[in-house]
UniProtKB/Swiss-Prot annotation:
Catalyzes the attachment of alanine to tRNA(Ala) in a two-step reaction: alanine is first activated by ATP to form Ala-AMP and then transferred to the acceptor end of tRNA(Ala). Also edits incorrectly charged Ser-tRNA(Ala) and Gly-tRNA(Ala) via its editing domain. One of its GO terms (biological process) is negative regulation of DNA-templated transcription. It comes from the Bacteria. Its main location: cytoplasm. InterPro entries: aa-tRNA-synth_II/BPL/LPL, Ala-tRNA-lgiase_IIc, Ala-tRNA-ligase_IIc_anticod-bd, Ala-tRNA-synth_IIc_core, Ala-tRNA-synth_IIc_N, Ala-tRNA_ligase, Ala_tRNA_ligase_euk/bac, DHHA1_dom. Pfam families: DHHA1, tRNA-synt_2c, tRNA_SAD. The lineage of its organism: Bacteria, Pseudomonadati, Campylobacterota, Epsilonproteobacteria, Campylobacterales. Its cofactor is Zn(2+). It comes from Wolinella succinogenes (strain ATCC 29543 / DSM 1740 / CCUG 13145 / JCM 31913 / LMG 7466 / NCTC 11488 / FDC 602W) (Vibrio succinogenes). It is found in: Cytoplasm. The gene is alaS. GO terms for molecular function: alanine-tRNA ligase activity; aminoacyl-tRNA deacylase activity; ATP binding; tRNA binding; zinc ion binding. Gene3D superfamilies: 2.40.30.130, 3.10.310.40, 3.30.54.20, Bira Bifunctional Protein, Domain 2, Threonyl-trna Synthetase, Chain A, domain 2. This is Alanine--tRNA ligase. It catalyses: tRNA(Ala) + L-alanine + ATP = L-alanyl-tRNA(Ala) + AMP + diphosphate. Its EC number is 6.1.1.7.
Amino acid sequence: MDIRKLFLDYFASKGHAVYESMPLVPDDPTLLFTNAGMVQFKDIFTGKVPAPTNPRATSCQLCIRAGGKHNDLENVGYTSRHHTLFEMLGNFSFGDYFKEQAIDHAWEFVTEVLGFSKEVLWVTVHESDDEAFELWQKHVDASRIKRMGDKDNFWQMGDTGACGPCSEIFVDQGEEKFHGSEDYFGGDGDRFLEIWNLVFMQYERSSDGTLTPLPKPSIDTGMGLERVAALKEGKSSNFDSSLFMPMIRKVEELTGKPYHYESGASYRVIADHIRSICFLLAQGVNFDKEGRGYVLRRILRRAVRHGYLLGLNAPFLHEVAEVVCGQMGDHYGYLKEKREHIKRLTFQEEERFFATIAGGMEVFKKELEKTQSVFSGEAAFKLYDTFGFPLDLTEDMLREKGIRVDLAAFEACMKEQRARAKASWKGSGDELKEGDFALLLEAFPSNSFVGYEKEAHTSKLLAILNRDYKRVSSLGAGESGFVMLEETPFYAESGGQCGDEGELRARGRIVAQVQGTKKYFGLNLSRIEALDEICEGETLEAVVSRERLEVQKHHSATHLLHAILRQKLGDHVAQAGSLVEKDRLRFDFSHPKALTHEEVGMVEEEVNRLISLSIPSRTREMRVDEAKASGAMALFGEKYGDLVRVVDFGEASVELCGGTHVENSAHIGSFYITKESGVSAGVRRIEAVCGMAAYHYGKEALQEIAEAKEILKAKELKLGIEKLKEQVRELKSEMSALSSSKSGAISEGVMMGETRVIVETLEAGDIKNSIDEIKNRYEKVAVLLLQVKEEKVMLAAGVKGEDRIKAGAWIKEIAPILGGGGGGRDDFAQAGGKDASKADEALQSAKNYALERLA
């Protein structure tokens, strides 16, 4: 039974538009991941955007709850129905049908399409919702309808805003399976399982708690696919269903051990976590030290650790990923397209963690032996800081033994990192909460952008904010703030393209310089510095800076670059971020390794070839589904409306894009890659210049070459460099010979058994080279040399073929005598000191140290 298809087809037959699952990374700074089906319709429910033409919608939404407010990670594997990734089936009405039809649809689908017996179905409603109680009685006997309080049956998005009562449908799994004291309807047991939540959004809650009926109430429902699938297959646990057993069977194959539910938590963790790993990697999230990438890393490391418990001591998750891509790739086609990319990045991250997990587990076991009930916070921090064990992974390991971590001590160790993290968020938007944006949104729901067609436009000045985002009626000369034009030609920063700069003109002169443009809560606002008084309500001429053309050149170049990277490196390449400015571009993309010098050159040449073909650009507006069907590249993480702009340069590049572009590829001029580097695991970065910036880059490069030739006194730079390299080689050879002669002059020391001990002052030469020369001369030797240069002291020690003396420990013992410090490996160490007057004392102590250990 394909429940996903049955659900979408059913609601399509009821006049609902079918929406694709939105990206797991939402265009919403308040959310870490998409965690509910209604997220992609949030702006409609809150009134920020108007309802679509068809006010009925349905979707099967991928959701992740692992990190942030909604975090199920620690429960996964230990319960029958917690998951990091799940699919939420939902139907939505935006001011169209309400309770009666929502209830009728739900009942019909559950009983007639899914085939659940009416005898096993129960319903809850809010204690005050008499209307829902009456409507349900058309389908269910009143004895099977239970009234519940706000905690269970009232839904709200936040402290204020849209909210309303909800109604839930439950399935009775049978008394014969579940018969604990909590297994009654409304209890905390597992006998009665909720499968569908119908939210009746009918109120607006004000700041004082007052509920005001909405003029057009809406419907938001959610049904967990995994839970319904398990019930339809007669399974008590989601993990026993056909959605998870293929991954569990693969783990059985890899371990050679059979899965049993009672002891199979590790199998369930792996089966769950690999789904999240596959989808996040496919959608452009990469392993990282912070943010979403860190959550992904935690998920993988938790799965690896559970594999380690099962005896898997080498990378294995990439093999389980193959199963996920095969099983779910028919509905989510990009899993098959990105299969090799997913497996490669998973394998690489596993390798990194397996390199440290054994050492970390050793530290964990030793600390555990000393632990009664509380695990050392310092040890937990060491596991985190040195071995890459996230705190929740350590807690997970201890949970099985009934032990907790000393969180206070752990937090004390983390204090410095937390302070740095807090500092990095400074200015990230908290000050905006104090601004007057609510007043602007109430007075002017939006302002329109007209800059695609024109770069100068006369418009009314609707509102002014000062630099603290407070609304004011005017700004005087020298004051800075923000302006909202009724129609603006200034492009607001978006999609990596910087916001437009320019001028505001009135009364025959320039009255303000526009220094940038951004969207704030959907409003296009330009940051300005006033040169003369400007007032709300007056008419201004807005003129975009000519530098926008240079920005457009760089933006169009990123499209061509993206296309060439996919063509030359593979379809796994996906945009992971970009920055487009007037004098440079930066393009981040998914790729597992650094580009070779030849690959960089090839990419640069191919982009320039497309530029030289003088390909006209074309911009079209079309429905998002039509655009994707036509082959236009859509980027994960981007939020698209019903209508989208498609920008193409012939067949070379076709992308969904809201930015501004050149009219012809030839207008880009030329394209030079200035740098290729890594951003994080699996993400590379190309920096480049084009247009006038490319001209200046080339001119400066030629100037540097001319200056270098002048310095080298060479007509050809390459010949001059080769000559210089030869001179350097000769000088190094002379220095090495000199160093060897000096080290040869050092005494042969004393023999202690079979080991030669040399402790001497080095008058001249390189101290490290001298140590190496002496070590090469003898089979067993412990040597420490001291050298004084300009009142500073250098110490170096080397040990070969002798375990009783460690060079690092030797140096640490002697360096303090000279007022310094240092250290190193067992075979070589060095240090510096400040007090040259103690040189003789230090040498004597060094001799005594060696002789005592070899006696």
